[in-house]
């Protein structure tokens, strides 16, 4: 499958974000560091929810590394694996690879235990991934498709999918 320019650019952003040590390859330790940094910024260290987030991030890495055939993916290998396992499989790819991470993030953000993300919880999320909190309200309004005042896991997975497909400009996994 040949990726559209926006899709390719978004995956390249993801590669740069996840190459945490800047060595030109994405490794399991990069995903561990990313998960641990998010957990720390959300103040969730030592919780069962933090363990789930770490496991989800490492599960996502493992799927991509298996598709790439390498535990250290260079840019080309990462782009090919992400296209094959996520973009190329459409909703099924996002459900399989991305949804566990979104569910784990919601598990940490969801302070009131309703299984969804409120506007206040969204502010915490944006701050944790290094995005300007001022855009959280605008992003929330755009993503709240059912106008419930809360974001479901489905709405968030769809938003990540739409970002990577170039349908929105809200980088929920960071930039």
Q: At which residue positions do the language-model features occur?
A:
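Primarily EF-hand calcium-binding motifs
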Residues: 7-22, 49-75, 99-113, 135-153, ...
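Surface-exposed beta-loop interaction hotspot
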Residues: 81, 91-105
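The feature marks the first
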Residues: 2-48
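Short helix-capping and inter-helix turn/linker motifs at the boundaries of alpha-helical repeat units
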Residues: 2-6, 51, 96-97, 129-131
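Short, charged, intrinsically disordered terminal tails
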Residues: 167-175
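Amphipathic regulatory helices of Ca2+-sensor modules
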Residues: 27-45, 72-89, 116-130, 152-166
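Short acidic, glycine/proline-enriched loop segments that cap or flank alpha-helices
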Residues: 90-94, 110-113, 127, 131, ...
